[in-house]
Design a protein with these regions (language model features):
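A short, flexible helix-boundary coil/loop motif
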Residues: 165-177
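An anionic, glycine-rich sequence signature occurring as long contiguous blocks
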Residues: 24-137
């Protein structure tokens, strides 16, 4: 079983809990403030291209394993931290924590098999779940429009059904995409 989570799941307590249950995980990881120092220690040849969902190299996005550079005291043994660097898209707002023009994001995993590219692609696929949540909110889950609890409970079921219909129709109609 694999548990995937965004940055909210990247805590010592949660990863220890998952490790104690012998569950594989891939969770967002908050990089420390001194990340630029670590970034500059990584030679250019260490970075490998990130992949698109179709398995092709994504231009301008690279991956490196920062596990040996970070202080991971208190984190579960065997945890790896994989960093993705990517140039922000044209027009994107730059952030204070961008390093040398790259936006750095990271995730932690206890999976030992697979390339950095495979692990990062697997982690990024959690975005489908986040997309389904966004669709559910757009479909009507963002607000409960009725006054009674039972009425809103029925409303939530209707929204869930509509979200399922949207997901299935997209999978069936756009199977090759």
């Amino acid at each position: 079983m694999l548990i995937r989570a965004d940055g909210a799941g990247g805590t010592k307590e949660f990863t220890k809990w998952l490790t104690g249950r012998r569950v594989a995980y891939s969770v967002g990881f908050t990089l420390p403030m001194d990340t630029p120092d670590f970034y500059h220690l990584v030679p250019e040849w260490v970075w490998v291209p990130a992949l698109n969902s179709d398995g092709e190299a994504r231009e301008g996005a690279d991956l490196a394993d920062f596990t040996g550079l970070l202080d991971l005291d208190g984190w579960p043994a065997g945890m790896r931290v994989i960093v993705r660097r990517e140039r922000p898209h044209p027009g994107a707002q730059l952030r204070f924590d961008d390093v040398d023009g790259y936006r750095l994001t990271a995730f932690a995993t206890n999976t030992t098999l697979g390339t950095l590219q495979q692990l990062e692609l697997r982690h990024r696929r959690r975005a489908r779940c986040e997309d389904r949540i966004r669709i559910a909110k757009d479909t009507g889950l963002a607000n409960l429009p009725l006054h009674g609890f039972d009425q809103n409970r029925i409303w939530c079921q209707i929204v869930a059904l509509a979200s399922e219909l949207q997901a299935w129709s997209a999978m069936l109609a756009l199977a090759g995409h």
